[in-house]
């Protein structure tokens, strides 16, 4: 059992089972291709734990709903500014029903949604599968470099 971390075989198993991407990496702001031990390529859609409501359960984490929404808002401000300079990024916002589905936690969701609405066309709100499809189209595997 691996709990939240991966085993050395996880990505191979994901490929074998037909998964199109892995979102269990915390190491980047952009999707990328990774070579798995059997030589296959796996699309990695990194996940950011800093913008995750689980921080409400961490002793040094978020306390008030505005802690999460302010943090996400600050991240959005930086990423929108960077996008204005031509740099793309991926911001994952992790929400769990058992946390932000509760009344006080849901206030954070409302605040985040309001901020996203303010940004309008400056951002793309997408499901992970849509991000994966877009990345595959824009960054196909170059088999000549294999």
Regions found by a protein language model. Name each.
Residues 1-87:
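Active-site-adjacent pocket scaffolds in enzyme catalytic domains
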Residues 21, 69, 73-146:
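C-terminal domain-boundary segment and adjacent tail
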């Amino acid at each position: 059992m691996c709990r939240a971390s991966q085993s050395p075989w996880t990505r191979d198993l994901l490929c074998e089972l037909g998964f199109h991407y892995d979102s269990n990496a915390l190491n980047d702001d952009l999707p990328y291709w990774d070579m798995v031990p059997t030589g296959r390529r796996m699309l990695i859609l990194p996940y950011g734990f800093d913008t995750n409501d689980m921080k409400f359960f961490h002793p040094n984490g978020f306390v008030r709903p505005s802690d999460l929404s302010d943090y996400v808002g600050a991240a959005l401000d930086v990423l929108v500014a960077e996008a204005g300079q031509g740099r793309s990024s991926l911001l994952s916002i992790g929400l769990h029903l058992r946390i932000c589905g509760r009344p006080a936690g849901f206030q954070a969701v409302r605040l985040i949604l309001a901020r996203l609405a303010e940004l309008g066309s400056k951002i793309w709100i997408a499901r992970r599968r849509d991000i994966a499809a877009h990345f595959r189209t824009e960054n196909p595997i170059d088999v000549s470099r294999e």
